[in-house]
A protein has these predicted regions:
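Rossmann-like AdoMet
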Residues: 1-104, 108-149, 162-165
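Conserved SAM/SAH-binding loop
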Residues: 151-156
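A short, conserved alpha-helix within the catalytic core of class I
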Residues: 179-195
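Short, glycine-/aromatic-enriched active-site segment of Class I SAM-dependent methyltransferases
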Residues: 215-232
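Short alpha-helix
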Residues: 232-259, 282
Length: 294
């Protein structure tokens, strides 16, 4: 595992956030009445724990001890598991309509979604930065229908590999866009629309009020401390309404949206009360668009 430890030292603070959902999926899988079943996440975290236990990184050491954040640890795990489950369902619904469709996971990290929703026909692309894909290749192998692309989402050359397909495409972005600025979100979305008209985009978004709170140093530092994150990690991009992307240009059509509290999941417990507050209910949520031709 020395190779993995060296690779982890080469990624940015923001890329390192991929470890948090990974550990949440593993922890939830091993819980009573799990909401998701991600044995691959369990396998990976068990291998990482032996390295992280003696790491110089506070985040690594905390993860090895099963401490994902400073407070509401179990609820946070459930929160991310519900989010993961919903993205899985979006993919499954897409494949029920187009069984031989193409799914592109932007900022994939160490996601094992392909193994959970593979219907035997889907063409799958996992895209992330080269240093992240280098780590990913230590745990995953490419197959005839599952591919890895080592690229920044801003380097549009990666789209040329996807462009070879003639099938319908779904792009998903879980835990990615909020760490970018608006122009860095808008630019690839418009390019995807231009190159792949008719595709779907499902992405997680942050509410603008959360972004404004994190602009204050006190709250930004608290956010970083709660999750044991590096000083460069903060959120930049947010929206106020699910239809905000439609203002970026013609052909972007809002289809639907979903919040964590829409499932009324019992394992959330007292956090379900947040559904009573419009602001808290949509502090972070998922939006679904179709990117039509211009």
């Amino acid at each position: 595992m020395e190779t993995t430890e060296a690779s982890m030292n080469n990624i940015t603070d923001i890329s390192e956030t991929l470890l948090i959902p990974l550990y949440c999926r593993a922890r939830e899988t091993q819980s009573k009445n799990p909401l998701i079943n991600d044995r691959k996440a369990v396998e990976i975290t068990e291998k990482l724990n032996s390295v992280f236990a003696t790491s110089t990184s506070p985040l690594h050491r905390r993860l090895a001890k099963g401490k994902l954040r400073r407070s509401a640890n179990k609820k946070f795990t459930v929160f991310l598991a519900i989010r993961t489950r919903k993205f899985d369902r979006y993919c499954q619904e897409f494949l029920s309509r187009t069984p031989n469709g193409v799914i592109v996971e932007l900022g994939c990290g160490l996601s094992s979604r392909f193994s959970r929703i593979d219907n035997g026909a889907v063409e799958w692309y996992d895209l992330d930065l080269p240093e992240v894909i280098a780590i990913r290749k230590q745990f995953f192998q490419e197959t005839a229908r599952s591919h890895m692309i080592a690229s920044s989402v801003f380097d549009f050359q990666w789209m040329e590999q996807i462009a070879k397909t003639k099938n319908t495409i779904l792009f998903i972005a879980e835990g990615l866009l909020m760490y970018l600025c608006e122009d860095d979100v808008k630019s690839p979305v418009l390019e995807i629309q231009h190159r792949f008209p008719g595709c779907d985009l499902v992405c997680e978004v942050e509410n603008m009020f959360v972004i404004n709170v994190l602009k204050k140093e006190r709250w930004r530092k608290k956010f970083q401390q709660d999750y044991h994150l590096g000083p460069d990690v903060t959120m930049h991009f947010g929206i106020r309404d699910g239809k905000d992307f439609e203002h970026w240009g013609q052909g972007i059509r809002f289809l639907d949206e979903w919040t964590i509290f829409d499932d009324h999941e019992k394992k959330l417990g007292w956090m379900n009360l947040f559904a009573c507050s419009k602001r808290l209910r949509k502090a972070q949520w998922i939006v679904h668009y179709q990117l039509q031709s211009l």
